[in-house]
Amino acid sequence: MKRLISTPFVFLLGLNALVSAAENPRIVLTPLRGHLYVVEDYFYLKENSMVYVGDSSVTVIGATWTPETARLLADEIGKITPKPITEVIDTNYHPDRAGGNAYFRNIGAKIVSTNMTNDLLKVHWTEMVRYVQKGFPSYPTLPLVAPDKTFAGNFELQDGGVRAIYLGPSHTPDGIFVFFPKEKALYGNCILKEQLGNLDFADLTEYAKTLQKLKQLNLGFTTIVAGHWSPLHGPELIDQYLQLLSAKDRSKSGAN
């Protein structure tokens, strides 16, 4: 694993901590369309997750930052449906995607991930919690809660209404996209957002290749939900992020 913290990342975290505090940290659940809801989690560094309300149960995509944020999300879900939360997908091994595991397990949900995410959680969880605490000292020291069920690669939940897709390393080695075919929506996870964001754990050699593979799938989605900052974007977000990666690469080359 790379060095624990970078000065630019500390600066970024500090700025976002001030913004989040000013906005009164909270969980906001907003309908998108069909079965889908967008979660905006204003705690720590703002992150966006998703909720799929199926015929008989609810699937949460991204466990949010902590057991407390997970509880707040569950409360919001309870306002829109009496259906139980039965599955929670850890979309990568970082705390913003797996920190709420303990709460969800306690209410009876199964934690789901790829084998790779499960392996990385078991090896790096304590280190990742300390990493977050460098930028956010109030972040709790959470024990590892590993997934209950894992998959070797791509998987489907909710009778195919929720499709997890792994295409290669990007923001992390293990990050997945989640596609919702009926709603023509894609959850971009931490892989896609309007800013470059934290690249301390990114594979900058493979990142653009992974995004090109996503484009080549021609999934036909009309909405991308970004993992951080503003949630709602069109398919053009992929090319926008590719441009950000390319500009960073040119800047690095120019400095040599």
List where the protein language model places each region.
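Bacterial N-terminal signal peptides that target proteins for export
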Residues: 1-9
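Hydrophobic h-region of N-terminal signal peptides that target proteins for export
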Residues: 11-20
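Metallo-beta-lactamase
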Residues: 23-26, 30-32, 57-59, 65-66, 118-241
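Conserved beta-strand hairpin/beta-sheet module of binuclear metal-dependent hydrolase folds
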Residues: 30-75, 176-190
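Divalent metal-coordination and catalytic microenvironments
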Residues: 35, 52, 62, 77, ...
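Active-site metal-binding motif and surrounding structural segment of the metallo-beta-lactamase
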Residues: 55-57, 67-112, 217-220
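Binuclear metal-ion centers of metallo-dependent hydrolases, dominated by the metallo-beta-lactamase
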Residues: 235-256
